[in-house]
Amino acid sequence: MDSSAGDPGDGVPSKRARTERDPYRVETMEFLVLVKSELPDDVYSHFVRSMIKIRRQRNMSIEKCKEIILEILDGQPEAIQVFEHFIQGYSPCRAKMRSKAHNFVERVKACPDISREDFHALLNVLAKYYKNEIKTSEEVLEKVERIIGNYPEFLEEFKIFVPHHLRAHLPNEKSCTSPKSSRVSETFVSFTLDAMNKLDGLRVKATNGRNQATPLKYTQDQNQNHEGRGYSLRHKQTKRTTGLIENPRKQGDDKSPHAEDDEEHKAEPLLQWSTSRENELPLKVDPSNCKHCTPSYCLLPKNCVTLQSSYQTELGRSILNDSLVSVTSGREDCYKFRTKNQYEENMFKCEDDLFESDMLLQRFRATADFIEDLQYRFGSNVKIQEHLTPLHKRCIEQLYDDSGIDMLDALSESENTSSALAVILSRLNQKIGDFSEARLSLNKMCPDTVANNYYRSLDHCSPSFKQLDMERMSPKALLAEDKQISRIKSHTDIHIHEDVGVIINYAYSRSCSTEDKPMMNWTKLVKAFVSVKFQWPDLKDTVSRRNVCEHCGMSRDFLNNIPVAVLTNEFVFSSKEVESLRAKSNESTSSLDHFDAEVEEGEFIPDVENIQLRVRCLPTNNSMHSTYGHWSGSEEHKSSRDDSNNEVGSSEYFGRTSKECDANRGISCCTLAVLCRLLQVMYERLLVAKNLSEGASTHDSYAHFKEKLCSLIDGSTDNWNFEQHCLKFLGPNSYVLFTLDKLIDRVIKQICKIYPSREDSSVLQRQERSRRTFNILKDPALPARRTNSSKELLHHQNARGTSIELPKQGREEAKGGCESHGDTGKMKQNHFQRRKKRALENGPPSFSQPGSGNQAHN
Amino acid sequence: MDPSSAGAGGNSLASASCGDAQKRRVCYFYDPEVGNYYYGQGHPMKPHRVRMTHALLAHYGLLAPAKMEVLRPLPARGIDLCRFHSDDYVAFLRAVTPETQLGQVRALRRFNIGPDCPVFDGLYAYCQTYAGASVGAAVKLNHGTHDIAINWSGGLHHAKKSEASGFCYVNDIVLAILELLKLHERVLYIDIDIHHGDGVEEAFYTTNRVMTVSFHKFGDYFPGTGDIRDIGYSEGKYYCLNVPLDDGIDDDSYQSIFKPIISKVMEMYRPGAVVLQCGADSLSGDRLGCFNLSGKGHAECVKFMRSFNVPLLLLGGGGYTIRNVARCWCYETGVALGEELQEKLPYNEYYEYFGPEYSLYVAASNMENRNTNKQLEEIKCNILDNLSKLQHAPSVQFQERIPETKLPEPDEDQEDPDERHDPDSDMVLDDHKPTGHSARSLIHNIGVKREITETETKDQHGKRLTTEHKGPEPMAEDLGSSKQAPTADANAVAVNAPGNARNEPGSSPK
């Protein structure tokens, strides 16, 4: 200590600051002071020189270091005790002074001349000092003198704790005012710390003393605690005022009070929890009684009693909020806030299994490592209970199941635990092996589970989307949607158009392969309609209100704008009939056509509104009748129509309307609008797929997607796998593609409506598709079947080439028969189809008879 | 570390502007024991996620001393916890055990210990560990030796002064901010956990020295606080911002509101340090969350805060789908370091959690975004309007702080020239240097502690011994030897490497 006098004066404040900032430095200083006071001078010098040597030998082990030091301190039990405390991280002074304080209080209590009342009064003074009710040491000394003044030996011993503090107080103040401290001042600073620690020891004892209180004393403690808390509030206010006053001071002056405050707090022991403390806690504040300042905060009443912190720094007291509290609601652990799909739940279960397995494995491993460390470092002379953490104890308890607690008790009681540790370690390692094997099993199971559930766990939209999409794809919805959509659209991606055509062609070829020519027509038809959409901007120029159909919003001139070449080249209609269709479509019968279309689909339900529409159409029918008078000459035809209408109870006028609708059933603007809308939707979705594939990391995801879609269409893959592919390679936003197969089905169905000659074969198509699917499942020789289909196609094409018109006439006749017979008509229809087939097989001669009959009829 | 870096630390106080390309000096706090604490079967909070994060960092090679400094934290002492929490609360946490809790129903209710915040083995030690890491990280930032400090085990933002809340017992964020306030006049706290950061906000609700900004799900959701009209009180008025959001918010929507608001905050408030709570329960697919952020979207906030080049403290927080939490925080550690990590995860002992893609990136789902552009625009206008009412940064001169900051340096140089080469050794030296003693005495204590540290380090490395759990004070000896479970050889090597590197300068002859 003498050698430190040479330090520069201006360094003292920073040194002091750093000393006070770091408790380890203080403890080291305390340790050295005690050792020097305990040891003879020569032993102390030897001690210091040994420390220097130890520092120079950097690779010295901890055990050897302790061995050397203990050898030097041999014969000095108190010094050894101080050293042991220091090594374990406790304050040496604190431990020593705690022992002295305890001794002092015990002897005062044991003295027969001091009454119990006086003894309790002494404890009371110390307790009050501890709780800051008595603020100054002078007051403590004064009260103690009054209590035990008659016993000089006790009073003199008590002064060991107090007089240094009193004497050091004045020099300490002096050192604060002086920038340079003298050698003597430093000595006093050191003693001041020593004195504070002595008082600290005394306070600790005072706390312990309360535990010995009588029931009456207990009651007094309660009251005191209550007063203490009240004082704490006042104390806080005083501190704030003090802080305000101190703010204008110089920086250097501000530093000392803050540092001193920290020092004092560090010295005080933490509050010890006891079960009796539970009853003394003030109740939690009831928010409903408090004034709300902002939505989530309420202002605490001024007289509110809340739990306090004795260790807040000056900074903390000035900044932390203790006047408002927030009002929370609910629990963080609550699962109801988000709807999770089952796949997500499966992922969570898998994760939890891995987690629980890992926790067991890691904790047992940590305990085993810890015990190995114990064995290595301490051999058999160790009280294991002192070193085990709660986690280690829990592991050992679980290790022995029902006997776990007994095992822990045995460990704590036994003196020689090395053998027990060896047994426990062996059991732990065995358990670790078991857990490791279980983990390996999980490692094999989990990949399958996560692979099956991960992609779908990211999908929260597709279930509701599928339901909505079915409704959205109905003709009514499509027509309503079409009216609202602006027709001016720019479709810049021609490749998507080609893809739409290719896919529909593929889908159609999968559904029916018995006739080659119709397939070719469908391919070109789709292309035609796709290209028609490019002309929609032109249509707008010619659109007027009078010419717009009230149901689909499409211009009645739509057909007029379709290139004649398209219809002529691709349809079986003759030029004459095309002209006729155009003329008919210009009339107002399109609305009735719409009704009939819905009847066919089983969606139409007659209501007042529809009947009114029919009534409004009557005058137009009359006009048309007069225009096309040539129909009235066919008495036989008209008569048959009337008969069928009578069966449904229609009047003569309705009969006429029905007849005219039949003529236009093959093609109407609404039907075309639905088809265009479906193609539009399909375009949009393929565009989504293409955009998503561009964002995907996999190369050429779009091509793979199209392959997968074709597989779905031909039945080689199912919906689940198709959806899995989309989610995996195109991401969770690809859910809009999940209904593409249904969308394509509707497109095919809609195309069949537009081509009248194929309308009757829609049932046949479905039968063919079902039969084909069945065959795909049963017959692996698919190529062979395709060869047969090809031959059949050639045969039919050749047959049709010689008499293109006659089959159409035959079909019309068959359809008429169907209507007149209701449900049984379907069976008859099948009968007619079978008859037709046989007729075809008989060759041209069989056609001449019905052909000539039809001609005569016309 | 050369003196110029110390100067750079000083510059950060003045918020000097640096390009993003510049490397940040990062320190990372991790305690190997933290993953062993267990809230209970079926409880969503799993400290194990921090251990998983650490394993990913190790196998990506981010724990190399050349990349960042890895530190094992000193557990916070009871006195340190009482800087914010009340005496009785801390005393109760220290004393209560699963066995003794049954007889203390009244106290459990008073301190809100229950299903959300259960009593489990080692509860108090767990609190000491993560709080000590956060405070230690703040101290590192104060020293100016690092630009970014990370503690993924921290970020427990719900804890109140005298009660636990929302899986949180000790509010390490408040303690860390109090530490930062010793040096910085203003500290900014940003919370991107899906839950409102109510504990931190309440603690600083009446002061203008801390600004709290929380982006959270609001409306019939825990903790129920965080109304946009909660703007602070008294001196703290307008220094509290709450950004209420709705289900399904995605990356673009989130950044469209986060970046404008935080840019304005940084301009108006000019904090000396920023604390960013990176709760990962705002990610898509979280067990308790309902947002739809991808891992990259979540990390965009970290990247944005890093670009301001203000001392930055990164803390963990919520996050209950642990396979997503580990990847998110690993990715964000890479962001802090400026490292581009490969998407394919390296094999590690937790590899099976991350199937089937084994990707570093957390994917967003296709759930509906209920935040409309109009709503977000309204919220943004409201927040920016409150910000415009702020005084434009309090008028305290930075110069007043500089002398105090530099004051300790000359003395350290005079007493021991080696200290500049080993800042952590500086901490160790400070621990044991008594005032008023001769230089010889100083050398004695330095030698004693250093030898103990070195010896223990070697023991741990050679024999993979688990460090005995001593009292808080001796943990100073382990400051330079952060430790990992012995079975992970790569981890052991990576974790111990920084300690070895730090010992080299100290062992060089004077």
From Swiss-Prot, chain B:
Tissue expression per record: Expressed in roots.
Ranges of compositional bias, category Low complexity: 485-503
Keyword field: Chromatin regulator, Hydrolase, Metal-binding, Nucleus, Repressor, Transcription, Transcription regulation, Zinc
Active site: 158
GO molecular function: histone deacetylase activity; histone deacetylase activity, hydrolytic mechanism; zinc ion binding
Cofactor info, note text: Binds 1 zinc ion per subunit.
Residues reported to bind Zn(2+): 193, 195, 281
Reaction(s) catalysed (UniProt annotation): N(6)-acetyl-L-lysyl-[histone] + H2O = L-lysyl-[histone] + acetate
Region (Histone deacetylase): 24-338
Entry's Gene Ontology BP terms: epigenetic regulation of gene expression
Family annotation (InterPro entries): HDAC_PDAC, His_deacetylse, His_deacetylse_1, His_deacetylse_dom, His_deacetylse_dom_sf, Ureohydrolase_dom_sf
Main location: nucleus
Stated name of the protein: Histone deacetylase 3
Gene source species: Oryza sativa subsp. japonica
Site location (Polarizes the scissile carbonyl of the substrate): 320
EC code: 3.5.1.98
GO cellular component: nucleus
Similarity comment: Belongs to the histone deacetylase family. HD Type 1 subfamily.
Induction: Induced by drought and salt stresses.
Claim: Transcription is one of the keywords in the record: yes
Gene, per the UniProt record: HDAC3
